[in-house]
Amino acid sequence: MPMLREAAADLRAEARRTNERRLLVLAGERTAGHRAAEAAISAGGISRESVVAVGSGDGTHFETVPVTRTDSILGTTQAAIVLDCHEACRPNALGRMVGAVDGGGLLVLVVPPLDEWAHRRDDFDEYLAVPPATVEDVDGRFRTRIVRTLRQHRGIAVYDVDAQALQDNGLTDPAPRPAPPPIEVPAGSDFPSAAYDACLTRDQADALRSLEALSTDENGVVIEADRGRGKSSVAGLAAGSFAVAGEDVLVTAPSYRSARAVFARANELCSTLDMLSNDEGESGARVLRTAAGGRVRFERPPAAATLPDSPDVVLVDEAAALPVRVHESFLEAPRVAFTTTVHGYEGAGRGFDVRFRDRLAASEHTVHDVHMGEPIRYAPGDPVEVWAFRALLLDARGAVDPLVSDATPTEASYRARSADELVADEHLLRETFGLLVAAHYRTEPNDLARLLDAPNISVRALLVDGHVVSVALLSREGGLDAETRSAVYEGSRIRGNMIPDVLMSQLRDEAAGEPVGVRVMRIATHAAARNRGFGSRLLAEIRSDVEGVDWLGTGYGATPQLLRFWARNGYGAIHLSTTRNETSGEYSVVMLDPLTDAGERLHARHASWFAARVGHQMHDVLRDVDPDVVRAVLRAVDADPPMDLSRRQWRLVVGAAYGPALYSADPGPFSRLAITHLVSGDPGVLTPREERLLVCKVLQGHSVETVANRLDYPGTSAAMRALGDPYRPLVDAYAPSDVLDERDRYGS
């Protein structure tokens, strides 16, 4: 393979000279592709120890990582990565590998013949084939896009291993770049000079300087960056600087793995300054202590939101992954910093900007904004990054604000956009995907492939003057045959049928998989056009438009605001998860909007079951759900809970409301009456505080001390006295006439 060896050597030499990466595509038969990869790596002067192969490992002599474990490579850098795309072309894996190649390195793709690739079905296509669809129903539009962009972009060499022909050498012949100026320690810095010495770019040094604002209270810092800019590292340098000054730094992130870079840099700085107090300063530990008495510690978001031990500084890494409710808790800290990824390989974070900025600006913190654009591992303008951003739509954005800022729902046109239409119109595709990226942190490259190729996925949108203002991603679910339903009921997993799966496996309703439904996976409205009714208009259009469907549904992390939105649009709650989401700390709710008799029957029985069981769950697995979430969930249940109180139980409730009887004598009837009111009663009968009291004390059974503290009663006696107040109007509204004489005895 002399032609390949020469091309690989030239490609690697240019990559090293420019501190950029280059991409080498080896197209053709798989075994020949692996041989070509080894030859190219050798010709490029890269040692085997500096290479990771991603795939099954067959035919290679490099360290191998399964394609399903590419998350283990995040945060590492390699001189070369060989990604085998024959068994599966997984978009997330592709994006992650782009981010893991160091400047001067090579990303090698071993792929089928380019003209055939899109027409082949692989393991990822099996993943997209959601039952009852099969892999033959999956399309190849995403791989068609990959092939087209590989052929169009600079810095990408293409070699046909079957014909042993070089189709493109991938060389760009760039002009030499001037050396960047040295990084200097700013005058008057509060941080150690060693922290600035550890910065790799001017952007990092500027961000570190901004983080010095956290030396005084009532300051906040927001750092936004594309992936690979070193924002987590600079947060770690700041954390270490505060810790060596004796301060307590609380770090939180979606997972500890996400925050490893923070702890690694903090550990390195403290070691350089000889300030580590013990062996807990290892980068894998969750607490780092310094000789000055300071520390850097990690807590998961739900625990961190309580600000345990009153930290001096809070650092929130990958903030866009967390809900606004959690961020609001962090604003109680005197000093807080948020870092967030704008264009990421496993999720993007403009939603943080959309959802939280107003609250941050209204807080008592002076906010310092920082944007980091300079890569730390390769040169700016790196052609492989440019290709990945375009091919995977990592930089997709909605229309610029002025184009939609005056739009109204009445002037919008409704469109059902097919995948072929999206592929044919790059502008429309970028705006559509950009809105999903902006509104949902976990929108990732796999979602682009799902949007283009999955047979159960469809898109609906509202457009104004040709620009996407609101978009919904829909997933067709259900319609499962008896054999599949039986398997799921007995414990088998099923892809892509979230609502039928929950109803069949968790709630033991085997028949729930038979009706056909459409789940609204995601709905997003342009930030400049929110709170005007676009989302409601879009849902109404979808309801009128879908055919052959028994129900519409949705599932999401429950908040009072979202619950009210979906309930206003006709969706009723039928299930609340019994565990919190580990990242967001929220409980997930499932809601249905029935469209046919079959859908009505499904909705009616699950709404009734939910209303019947939720009171018991509140005393157990749902005991720590926020009272306002409970109120909103129950208000969204379309059912009539049974009010089967005996005459003696009614006399107890009436006597506690109007006379000397005690709630503690038998809490059961009080709970059933509370459920009835919260599900089907007039919401104007009780104040929000009175309803919270019912939830906290009567349904969840918290101690009177906890209730008094949470609801701001002056003491436990006041809280217990207040418990009688909401039951008076409830007795008046629900008690049968033959027990009202009990009320009349006390001069009501």
Each model region followed by its residue ranges:
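Terminal substrate-recognition subdomain of acyl/acetyltransferases
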Residues: 267, 271-292, 302, 313, ...
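Hydrophobic positions on the alpha1 helix immediately C-terminal to the Walker A/P-loop
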Residues: 36, 234, 238, 538
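Inter-Walker segment of RecA-like/P-loop motor cores
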Residues: 57-79, 254-305
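Conserved beta-hairpin
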Residues: 446, 456-474, 479
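N-terminal accessory nucleic-acid engagement/regulatory domains that precede
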Residues: 71-81, 85-178
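Conserved coupling/interface region of RecA-like P-loop/ASCE motor cores
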Residues: 133-202, 206, 358-401
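N-terminal pre-P-loop "Q-motif" helix
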Residues: 2-11, 196-219, 689
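Conserved RecA-like ASCE ATPase "motif II neighborhood" in helicase/translocase motors
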Residues: 62-96, 292-332
